[in-house]
Design a protein with these regions (language model features):
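Hydrophobic alpha-helical bundle cores within soluble ligand-binding/oligomerization subdomains
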Residues: 2-363
């Protein structure tokens, strides 16, 4: 019997069994929502802090008053360069991104020229501090083949039960639950932290792919296909294979995804989600709690979740701009967004601008 047929029966049975319970919960939630909704205006007024109190050394959003980032630590892992400081003034320069002192563009171009996959090499570089030899990379790939296999029963017991429909939430709660599958989750020795890190790098694509399949089935009414990772394939190839019902993908797709994985593997250690992870880790908490917190941060629309906001914003603009060729009409609606009169009322145009990069983004 096909693996997807086995899983299909389980998820369908679970969905039918929990339907009536969810209806009752929705009714109870409605009563609570009605109560809290009646108090929301008072709460907004009570917690509002006037702009006049933001002065001195108060840092808003990890930003200095001149727009530069707040120094939160020192790292040898990644470096981001987007401007120079001269006499207290920012001088824009073309953006550059370095992994362990190596310019990322050089790594990407080398793999593109050779037609090879580079994410695994980049992961090794970021973890260990140096580029692996051929033998070291081959051994690391063998370990990754093992790490991609989720614990027995994890997909059925965790991912298929009570799916939320949001992949980032599914990833976060799945990471937390992996604590229960770890024989030594609270050991903070370097040996154990490295083991957990390698396993999580392997687990992530499988968790996301399976959560995506369950989401399409549960909320989209599509047939459920759960595919196991295949040994000998790269992370990019395996992910594409697992999210497609027929396991098909092209070489171009795989190399494009591999390049994206390399480009987003590290970004200087000062972004919101990495900062959250470092703050949690500094308390001595376990790896799974720290990484799950980082994923929660990454989900936010002012961080990684901006991707989803860009899509929503485009849909909103399409609905309100009758002629895409009319630059004045497009500009007028963008002005409404900036003036907080349209879209989500935040005054933000998502996907534009960066806190560090000025002239260009090397990614």
């Amino acid at each position: 019997m096909e693996e997807n047929e086995i899983q299909y029966g389980k998820i369908t049975a679970a969905g039918e069994a929990g339907h009536r319970g969810r209806e009752q919960e929705m009714k109870e939630n409605g009563v609570i929502q009605e109560y809290t909704g009646s108090l929301s205006r008072q709460i907004r007024e009570e917690y509002h802090i006037s702009e006049e109190y933001y002065h001195g050394e108060i840092k808003r959003g990890l930003r200095n008053s001149d727009g530069t980032g707040v120094m939160v630590g020192v790292t040898k892992v990644g470096s981001v360069q987007g401007y120079l400081l001269q006499d207290g003034q920012r001088i824009p320069i073309p953006g550059r991104l370095y992994y362990r002192g190596i310019e990322l563009n050089d790594i990407v171009e080398a793999h593109r020229a050779e037609g090879t996959f580079g994410f695994e090499e980049v992961a090794y570089l970021l973890l260990m501090g140096y580029l692996p030899s051929q033998g070291e990379l081959r051994h690391f790939n063998e370990i990754m083949n093992r790490a991609r296999k989720l614990p027995e029963g994890f997909t059925e017991g965790m991912i298929m039960r009570r799916t939320s429909g949001n992949i980032m939430n599914e990833l976060g709660r799945s990471i937390l639950s992996l604590y229960s599958y770890d024989p030594d989750p609270d050991d903070l020795s370097v040996d154990n932290l490295l083991r957990q890190s390698v396993e999580l790098i392997g687990y992530f694509p499988s968790i996301v792919a399976n959560a995506y399949a369950v989401k399409r089935h549960h909320f989209g009414g599509e047939s459920l296909h759960i595919h196991y990772p295949e040994e000998g394939l790269s992370t990019a190839e395996n992910f594409l294979r697992m999210i497609r019902p027929d396991k098909s993908y092209t070489e171009e797709e795989a190399h494009l995804l591999d390049m994206m994985l390399m480009l987003h593997a590290e970004h200087g250690g000062g972004n919101n989600s990495t900062f959250v992870c470092r703050a949690l880790s500094s308390s001595g908490t376990d790896t799974y709690s720290a990484i799950a917190g980082a994923v929660g941060s990454l989900k936010g629309p002012l961080h990684g979740g901006a991707n989803a906001k860009v899509v929503s914003m485009h849909e909103d603009i399409r609905a309100h701009v009758s002629n895409w060729e009319d630059e004045d009409e497009v500009a007028a609606y963008l002005g409404k967004i900036l003036d907080k009169q349209a879209f989500d009322g935040t005054g933000l145009i998502y996907g534009m601008g960066h806190a560090v990069y000025t002239l260009s983004d090397p990614r």
